[in-house]
Swiss-Prot record:
SUPFAM superfamilies, per the entry: Anticodon-binding domain of a subclass of class I aminoacyl-tRNA synthetases, Nucleotidylyl transferase
Cofactor: Zn(2+)
Residues given in the record as Zn(2+) binding sites: 28, 209, 234, 238
Protein name, as recorded: Cysteine--tRNA ligase
Main location: cytoplasm
């Protein structure tokens, strides 16, 4: 029985889809004005994990993750670069997809772009105006009337009175209330725009997600996800817009993943502690980065450091050493490990406990490796099966363990030396065999001999 922590209720709830076995999930995606940073990677991996487990559990999932391809940041960056906004976003979308491929992220079923849904935004804004939840002051903008929506603040637990007292809000004489937020922005010189009933302009950020989600999944759906930094105001405003427009509950459950922290501080450009996914993947194996992101509970903050990456690498090496030398066969045996893994994942996608189960499974594989190799091979298949839920352990063991050799040692040279050493051993030329081993050790290569075969990896 799957339970999910619902940010809306602030409790774990038994997950009950709205429509039988069908699950509809919407996740706020990237604003594509720059290369994706590791915080984006956290969200990608977190909801990829949710996707994998829901499907593994037999649910028929429709996963939608949007792309914000028009925004102040996009316009500013395009102007800085001297290119059109759509040329910038096309380039960044391609880069994002490449980052996802390297991190083994499954493609969403739908990936709507804001600029493809302008007509739908016009329609929802007009509905809000007709119902009295929005107003056009005549300057080309349209604003949402926050004070009219009775449930405002129910996600973030913020009260309108406190927001008015505590918020630092720039005075905008066009607004009826300082808390009102923009649904449609009137055109400014040099900016891209679309025609609308209120004059040329472009959509506000919040209305984009309300329209794309309901267009793709319907007026009510099962799960809405995103980073914890989006809970307020973005997700709060989505609820206000969508429920005012439709009169129905917007999303049944809200899931928010934690932030990436560096030395205790949130990763951000302003603190100059910002790492793009591609920068990190230039240094670390993609599976190491993915394991770092998936091994912590999705709601927890992750501290990014050299030590944490080394720990992730060490964990994967233990897994792959257990798989090494065993044939790829169908998963067999280890039902108790499957049960424990399922219990962990059904408890709000509890990956720390699930990873602990994998370590126990590794110990059992190693225990049986010599005494019952067939049983060990079946359990190795089970390890890969469970690892696939986390998006790891699908590589050949030798390929992972040798990763990083390029630029450090010549793999062809290593293989030639190993063959020369095997010949020396066959000739019982032990001195030459030892000399070659010493040469390889000096190169940072560790040899492992077993049953007439020799494999190698780089030393830690």
């Amino acid at each position: 029985m799957l339970t999910i922590y619902n940010t809306l209720s602030k409790t774990k709830e038994v997950f009950k889809p709205l429509d039988g076995n069908k699950v509809r999930m919407y996740v706020c995606g990237m604003t594509v004005y720059d290369y994706c940073h590791l915080g984006h990677g956290r969200s990608m991996v977190a909801f990829d994990l949710v996707t994998r487990w829901l499907r593994k559990s037999g649910y028929e999932l429709t996963y939608v993750r949007n792309i914000t391809d028009i925004d102040d940041k996009i316009i500013n960056r395009a102007n800085e670069n001297g290119e059109t906004f759509d040329a910038l976003t096309a380039r960044m979308i391609d880069a994002m997809h490449e980052d996802e491929r390297r991190l083994n992220i499954l493609k969403p079923d739908q990936e709507p772009r804001a600029t493809d849904h302008i007509a739908g935004m016009h329609a929802m804004i007009q509905t809000l105006i007709d119902k009295g939840y929005a107003y056009a002051p005549g300057n080309g903008d349209v604003y949402y009337r926050v004070g009219k929506f009775v449930g405002y603040g129910k996600l973030s637990r913020k009260k309108i009175e406190d927001l008015r007292i505590g918020a630092r809000i720039e005075v905008d004489e066009a607004k009826q209330d300082p808390l009102d937020f923009v649904l449609w922005k009137g055109v400014k010189p040099g900016e891209p725009y679309w025609d609308s009933p209120w004059g040329p302009g472009r959509p506000g950020w919040h209305i984009e997600c309300s329209v794309m989600s309901t267009c793709c999944l319907g007026e009510s759906f099962d799960i809405h996800g995103g980073g914890s930094d989006l809970e307020f105001p973005h997700h709060e405003n989505e609820i206000a817009q969508s429920e005012a427009a439709t009169g129905k509950q917007y999303a049944n459950a809200w899931m928010h993943c934690g932030m990436i922290r560096i030395n205790g501080e949130k990763m951000s450009k302003s603190l100059n502690n910002f790492f793009t996914i591609r920068d990190v993947l230039d240094v670390y194996h993609p599976e190491v980065v993915r394991y770092l992101l998936v091994a912590s509970h999705y709601r927890s903050a992750i501290n990014y450091s050299e030590d944490s990456l080394r720990d992730a690498k060490g964990a994967l090496e233990r897994f792959y050493h257990a798989l090494r030398g065993l044939p790829r066969v169908a998963a067999k045996g280890g039902e108790e490990f499957v049960e424990r893994f399922s219990v962990a994942m059904n408890d709000d996608f509890g990956t720390p406990e699930a990873c602990a189960v994998l370590f126990d499974l590794v110990r059992e594989i190693n225990r049986l490796r010599d005494s019952d190799p067939d049983a060990a091979a079946g359990l190795a298949g089970r390890l890969r099966e469970l690892g696939d839920v986390l998006g790891v352990l699908q590589l050949e063991a030798d390929d992972f363990l040798r990763a990083g050799a390029e630029g450090k040692v010549d793999a062809a040279e290593v293989e030639a030396l190993i063959q020369a050493r095997l010949q020396a051993r066959a000739d019982k030329n032990w001195a030459e065999s030892d000399r070659i081993r010493d040469q390889l050790t000096a190169m940072g290569v560790v040899l492992e001999d077993s049953k007439g075969a020799t494999t190698w990896r780089l030393a830690d």
